């Protein structure tokens, strides 16, 4: 598969003006000031080349926060219902998200994800496919591993800490709890598209993310700057 390293600089994935505007005028103040956001492990994020970013999902806050904190633009596969939510829908679309129908085989979304990976983009996928009240990865789906197997892109586990407490399922108003984004070590793509290989890689992603969630808080461990 082509890597962004093989493209002239002008053709490599770049954030759009609207992406930059929303990130720094809206998402940054909310994450950094209101939620006292902190980051760990940003040096583990490959700066170029195709990448499948996998994360836990506990809140509607997750897509913009993940897109803001990682040091490269990320396009998201998000459930189609989110695009009908006032304010949130236009926001996540401006941040590079594209819709996928949950519970159905959405070939167009898969083609979009593969196309972006072929151009060297990072594509973000929430491993469960839907929010979990616990904030952990509880019921991981095989889609991320399949994308990785088809594209040859590595998987990057990312833990979003406390977003389920800040604005979880059923909550109308946010709670201003401290948020943290933790990045793990990249995981190689599955050796094949066979179901046992996809399941093994998916399980490795689940274990890596949940281990990051259980790690000591940033108050006792060194923290890297967000970007």
What label would you give each PLM region?
Residues 43, 80, 101, 159, ...:
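Residues at the C-termini of beta-strands that transition into short coil/loop
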Residues 2-41, 47, 65, 85-95:
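A transmembrane-helix-recognition feature enriched in membrane-embedded lipid enzymes
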Residues 32-33, 47-104, 112:
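Catalytic core of membrane glycerolipid acyltransferases/transacylases, capturing the structured
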Residues 37-42, 61-63, 110-112, 167-169:
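A generic local structural motif
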Residues 26-28, 94-100, 127-131:
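Short, basic, glycine/proline-bearing loop/turn elements
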């Amino acid at each position: 598969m082509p890597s962004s390293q093989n493209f002239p600089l002008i053709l490599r994935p770049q954030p759009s003006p609207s992406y930059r505007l929303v990130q720094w005028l809206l998402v940054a103040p909310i994450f950094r000031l209101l939620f006292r956001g902190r980051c760990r492990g940003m040096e583990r994020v490959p700066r170029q080349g195709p990448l499948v970013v996998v994360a836990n999902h506990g809140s509607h806050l997750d897509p913009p926060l993940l897109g803001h904190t990682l040091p490269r633009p990320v396009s998201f596969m998000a459930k189609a219902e989110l695009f009908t939510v006032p304010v949130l829908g236009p926001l996540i679309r401006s941040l590079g998200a594209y819709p996928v129908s949950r519970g159905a085989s959405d070939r167009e979304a898969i083609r979009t994800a593969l196309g972006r990976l072929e151009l060297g983009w990072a594509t973000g996928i929430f491993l469960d496919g839907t929010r979990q009240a616990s904030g952990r990865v509880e019921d991981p789906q095989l889609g991320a591993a399949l994308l990785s197997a088809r594209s040859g892109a590595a998987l990057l586990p990312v833990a979003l800490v406390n977003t389920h407490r800040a604005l979880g399922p059923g909550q109308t108003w946010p709670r201003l709890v401290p948020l943290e984004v933790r990045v793990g070590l990249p995981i190689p793509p599955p050796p094949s598209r066979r179901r046992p290989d996809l399941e093994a890689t998916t399980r490795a992603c689940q274990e890596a993310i949940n281990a990051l969630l259980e790690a000591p808080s940033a108050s006792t461990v060194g923290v890297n700057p967000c970007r």
